[in-house]
A protein has these predicted regions:
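The feature marks short-to-medium sequence segments in extracytoplasmic or secretory-pathway proteins
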Residues: 103-152, 264-268, 405, 418-482
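Bacterial lipoprotein signal-peptidase II cleavage site
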Residues: 36-46
């Protein structure tokens, strides 16, 4: 069964699992990528590098009997085939078809395959994405009829997830299936071209649920030494520099490290020669009185503004400099560590010509000479994998490759074991401080699979609901492993623009678990979709 600890109401905003797709295929041959195999139109899927877990996991072909993309994977130890799509838009909604089958002679129950907790029996945790547009769509239907009972050999099931309407001009989407993979290149067709009744699906759906979205994906990075972090969407970039590194204690005098910390901002300014709006805002903790903190925050913001003018030409930018004192903390001021997070200066750049940047959409530069932190756990090449411990048991963790799609990298870490492993999800979460700096909501998500590149730690892509809850595109539950079976942890990251990547699961404490998985996977090939 799955392992997911009940959590606050934030879970109700069901996390999109930003997933993994698959093996490289020849783009010139019209290949579509998903899971762990080569996806070819009209042909059989050929396996790619398999490192570790056995079994038919995540191999997809582009065309199934219903016109969708076929994903061959594994669920709870059973071979599973899911034909995903096509999808059709009608009015305010997009409807997809999942045709689910297995070669297992044993019953395979699907009630927890695509959702957990209060949403069992539905496809509520499936996510539809348009990575080219940096958009994610939550599932709205909540239909409990489709996935009741079991699927067995010769007795498939159909499910029909419902999402908000896609934008005009979208011809294909990505679809994330929890613990299975991300299917890429799912065709968007006319209502008349699908072999199911779109009106009937919409009529049966419970459409009084979550905000239909879509929600914008954001990219976030943290400097190797934690002195700054950056978030970015399609309109703006915000660099937050730590007050304790940039300034002397209780002072507006810049430290010797200030220029290297501000290098991230300088690089962002240089990317947009036409300029735009530049907002610099100082913040403090709550240690002194309000008046002192307000004055200090204003002086620090002004000091950053003046220093940036000396470091680079910012004359094309319309600048606004202010301080907010202790009035806008990132986290509660209830511990020394959290007060340190709140002492900061935020620099937001909103370029007038966002397309002007020649860098990767995720780019948030830092000096390439920045020291890569020493590994805190086992190290191995991604396709070969490493052994890690969970609940005192040994698991093998691998990742064959990642795929570049629409300004993102997608991939999945695969877990296998020769013994039964009771596996909670909390050991796969970021350290508490890093999670709070990013403002991630809740505690039960796979969020610790970061990429190290060019002096920065790239966090998993994430998005925020209207109520402010921010969640990564990854699993929010995992299943206990049985001997000889596999489980996939699909993830999406910002594109770092390299031919191979290193995934690092950083060390650090986390309030909700006594153990965290700490490891590093290197030399992971990047394949262009």
């Amino acid at each position: 069964m799955s392992s997911s600890t009940p959590m606050c109401s934030e879970t109700c905003a069901r996390l999109t699992r930003r997933g993994v797709l698959a093996l490289p295929a020849l783009a010139g041959a019209g290949a579509v990528l998903a899971g762990c195999g080569v996806l070819k139109k009209g042909g059989s899927a050929s396996s790619g590098k398999s490192s570790g877990a056995a079994s038919p996991r995540a191999v997809a072909t582009a065309t199934g009997p219903h016109g969708g993309v076929v994903l061959s994977t594994e669920y709870q130890g059973a071979p599973m085939t899911v034909e995903v799509g096509p999808v059709a838009v009608k009015g305010k909604y997009t409807v997809a078809r999942f045709h689910i089958s297995t070669d297992s002679k044993e019953d395979v129950y699907l009630s927890q395959a695509f959702a957990q907790l209060e949403n069992v029996g539905t496809t509520a945790d499936v996510r539809m994405m348009s990575l080219e547009q940096s958009l994610v769509y939550v599932e709205l239907g909540g239909n409990t009829e489709d996935l009741s009972g079991a699927v067995t050999k010769g007795a498939p099931k159909d499910a029909f997830p419902v999402f908000g309407a896609l934008n005009d001009g979208v011809h294909s989407v990505e679809m994330l299936l929890p613990n299975m993979g991300v299917v890429v290149g799912v065709p968007v067709v006319k209502e008349s071209e699908v072999d199911f009744n779109v009106d009937d699906v919409i009529a049966k759906a419970n459409l009084q649920g979550p905000d239909p979205g879509p929600f914008k994906l954001e990219r976030a990075t943290v400097s190797m030494d934690g002195s700054s972090d950056t978030k970015q969407d399609e309109k703006s970039t915000t660099v937050t520099v730590a007050g304790d590194v940039t300034f002397a204690t209780d002072s507006d005098q810049l430290s010797a490290q200030a220029d290297s910390v501000l290098a991230t901002v300088v690089e962002q300014i240089k990317k947009f020669p036409s300029g735009g709006e530049l907002t610099i805002t100082g913040h403090t903790d709550d240690v002194a009185d309000d008046a002192h903190n307000q004055d200090l925050s204003e002086r620090r913001a002004k000091a950053v503004s003046e220093r940036l003018k000396k470091l680079t030409d910012s004359s094309a930018w319309k600048e606004s400099v202010s301080g907010k004192g202790e009035s806008s903390p990132r986290v509660p001021n209830d511990t020394d560590e959290r007060r340190q997070i709140n002492r900061r200066v935020e620099i937001t750049l909103t370029p007038s010509k966002a397309a002007e940047s020649s860098a990767s959409p995720s780019a948030s530069e830092a000096p390439s000479s920045a020291t890569v932190p020493d590994p805190a756990g086992p190290v191995g090449k991604g396709p070969e994998g490493v052994d890690v411990k969970v609940s005192g048991k040994t698991m093998h963790m691998t990742i064959d490759h990642v795929v570049r799609v629409g300004g993102y990298l997608t991939g999945k870490v695969v877990l296998t074991s020769s013994e039964a492993v009771s596996m909670p999800v909390a050991p796969f979460a970021l350290p508490g401080k890093m999670m709070e700096m990013r403002g991630l909501s809740g505690v039960w998500y796979v969020s610790s699979l970061t990429i190290l590149s060019d002096g920065l730690r790239y966090l998993e892509a994430d998005y925020a609901y209207p109520n402010g809850n921010r969640v990564p595109l990854a699993n929010n539950f995992v299943y206990s492993l049985e001997p000889g079976t596999s489980q996939s942890l699909p993830v999406v990251w910002p594109d770092v623009g390299e031919d191979s990547i290193t995934i690092d699961m950083p060390a650090g404490e986390y309030l909700y678990t006594k153990e965290r998985v700490v490891a590093r996977l290197t030399d992971i090939p990047v394949v262009n979709a």
